Each structure stands twice: as structure tokens, then as C-alpha cells.
Amino acid sequence: MQTLHVNGYDMAYLDVGQSAGNGLPLVCVHGSLCDFRIWSSVLGPLTRKHRVIAPSLRHFFPDHWDGIGDTYSTAQHVDDVIAFIEKLDTRPVDLMGHSRGGNICFRVAQRRPDLLRKLILAEPGGELDATLDPAYKPGPSPLAGMIAASAETIAEGDIDGGLQIFLDALEGPGTWRRLPATPKQMLRDNATTLIGQMRDQRPLLSKADAEAIRHRRSSSAAPSPRERSRRCCMRWQPT
């Protein structure tokens, strides 16, 4: 593990595959409740052709954040990823984001396309506005309510109870109970970040946002509602 001092914060990251002579840097950005460890199972395949650089976003493991303050937000994480890439010894980079990390990477590509060679969105998170979703209705989304219920339980000190609310609502009843010990511990290590996510005012994804992305891009198959975000992003991005 290494660190880069980014926007007043020491961002921890893994840098794997450089010794193999790989010339294509791939920066991997994790999603909610995760950290750089989430990529462990795919480092082998990825490092066959890439130098993989996987940061942990601000306030995620190995940091143990108390949930206090206003320094956890999508905007802050976008700023941090941009500054992180700027400090690397090689660029442009391929940028891959999973879930909430996909949303962050999408915003990075909007703001700083000069830093990127390719954008990969894996099950990207984010809510769609009326220009992309005819069924859009203003107001809090069901996801926001789920995050709030989970975060409030975590803030009261019931880490496992809060994580169970989140996982079971997102993936189905019994998901938390069935989860193996290792991924459970990673979620516990990052549980307080849901307190910050509850307060995050993440902007909706729009048709104009997607049309602004000009770089080569790729995206994985994803379940609803992430599938809608993925398809809309791909549909409206110019070739």
C-alpha cells in the first residue's frame, strides 16, 4: 500500500503490475462501502495487460472515519480522483469505476477528458432526470430512504444492523446473513461512510451529461436500476 497527498488528504492506493512492464495504466475506483480491497479477486487478470492503480476514496479504509464533517461527497471524491490522476507518473489513464465509483468516474470524464484514454463504467450508480427517465418524479428516491435508514442505525452504534438494512434492501432479504466473513468485514470497515452518503447531494444524470462524454468508453451489463443508468449513458454518448 502507498499513499498520495491529495487535496489535504493522504489517499491510500495499490499499484500492481508495473514491474511486469505493462504500459497501460488502469485506475480502478470502488463503490459504496468498499475500498481498494474490492479489486483483489480480479487483479490477476487485469494485470496481464495493465498496471492497476486502485485508490481508496476519502474516508474509506484504511481510514476509520467517525462520520463527522462535510468532507464526504460526490463532488469531493471527483476532485480527489482528478488530483490523484494528476499526481501519477503516467497519463492519460484508463479509468474504471464500479457502482458509486462509476458515477464518480463519469463526472471525472466530464470535467477532465484530457486525463483519460478510456472510460469503463461497471454497474454505474446514479439517478436519472426527466431527460433520460420518462418516469422520473421529483423528490427523494427509494435509494435515499434506504441509505438514511441504514446510516441512522450505524450512527447509533449498530453497525451490523445498519449494514443488514442496506444489503437486504439492495440485494434481497437474507443477503447480509449469507455474506461470507471477509466481505462482511470490509463492509464493517467502511460502514460510517454511509453517514456521509446520506448527506450527499449527488446531482442527477442527464442526457446533456452523457452527450458531453467524448472519449472511448465501455460498460458492463448491470441489474436494474443501474442497468437504466448504464444504457442511458451509453445511448447518449457520442461515438
Roles of regions detected by a PLM:
Residues 169, 193-209, 226:
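Active-site nucleophile elbow and catalytic-triad environment of alpha/beta-hydrolase enzymes
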